Amino acid sequence: VFGATGDLAQRKLLPALYELSVQGLLPKKGEILGTATKELGDHGFREIAREAVKEFARTGYEETGFEVFAKRLRYVSTTHDQSGTGAKLAKAMKLPHRLIYLAVPPSAFVPILEELKGAGLTKGSSIVIEKPFGHDLKSAVALNVALHKVVPEERIFRIDHYLGKETVQNLLVFRFGNTLVERIWNRDVVAQVQLTVAEDIGIESRGRLYEETGALRDIVQNHLLQLLALTCMSPPSSFDPAALRDEKVKVLNSIRPVQPRDVVRGQYTRGTVNGVTVPGYREVEGVSPNSTTETYVAMRLAVDTWDWAGVPFYIRCGKALVTRRTEIMLYCRDVPLHLFEGTGIERLTPNRVTIRIQPEEGISFSFMAKQPGATVVEQPVRMDFSYGRSFKTQPAEAYERLLHDALLGDHTLFIGQDETEAAWRVLEPVLENTPRVAFYPAGSEGPDDANSVLLSGEWHELAHHSESEEAAASKP
């Protein structure tokens, strides 16, 4: 693990590896070799891992389980320019099969791999890399060319942790494992789709890094376009990774290039989130006082496939919003004729399917029902599926699933070269456009201008209670 003392390793990777160890899912003779620029020995690294597990492990810290895990942990310090890294690691890495995790900035990917190749450590090894996969289409293509000089595509695992979430995986089962669902999952029934990735935290201390990315590159290019591809893809010929990837690429290649008029970019100013004052983005250390980097994006997309032609897809993401929520909402078309006119309701509420990805994973379906009584009075109601209530278990964290799959060599939940480049191609016209940002206070729903990308109506409110919360509140 390169970057083994960094934030990602401590919050996600080490706790996930600990959970896999406790479950007996790591190779019996496997070792975990951490490397970073900090001068640490094996003991120091194990203590960092101990604190990370205590704070972030899904099932909590357990002394005996950790001691078994800690025996696998070793550490080698490296230099900032990676010189001599290969020779150091060659002495430490004796096992023939290696999974190399690059939890480092993208600019370090190629220098590290070239150093490892020179030491003979990339032969037979697989690598895992984190987003962003390039800065634009040109740099993404260049990165892939450079990676392929060191390792072949079949041994590259590009990780998007959203794909490791249970509900994202369940989306495929929900769609293709239920005849009723698949029959309504198209332009004949669906009027519009809204995809949301909302975060209630701001940039915090990552100002300098975020100035180089922004929400388009950080969230839209990967998380949101992956969710859209899974929502729109046709049934694959099998559940084989290549078959799944082919269908997702077809969707991405069918998206019309986004035009600047279909995009609203926003940037948060000082405000209050969950009762805490949040400084404005331009107040964060490392951010230009005149920055036009977007912390919010709302966008209209068109997917020109047989199933989805004419259906508008609206995607949005943002930092420092009123709540943390990731969901996909499919709004169905109105009924062709209102048979219940004169009952006090002028328009029936369209059916809606909601896939909740976080914070509480689940799926709900809203429909019209008659209220009890002598007269016909319609009211929207919901059927709700919650992972926590239905399975009485806590889903594994995304990194647990993804690390386990990478160890097994399973590419199903990872992103391929063609997907990465297709997603960048969609955004090229917007990335080349000089941005104008609309401001919104931290703790709000985002900029008012965001509604301008909608052909009709408004965005659904982020601050609404989840369907399962409402259902629980209504119980006696």
Predicted regions and their residues:
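Secretory/organelle targeting and membrane-embedding segments
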Residues: 1-128, 133-476
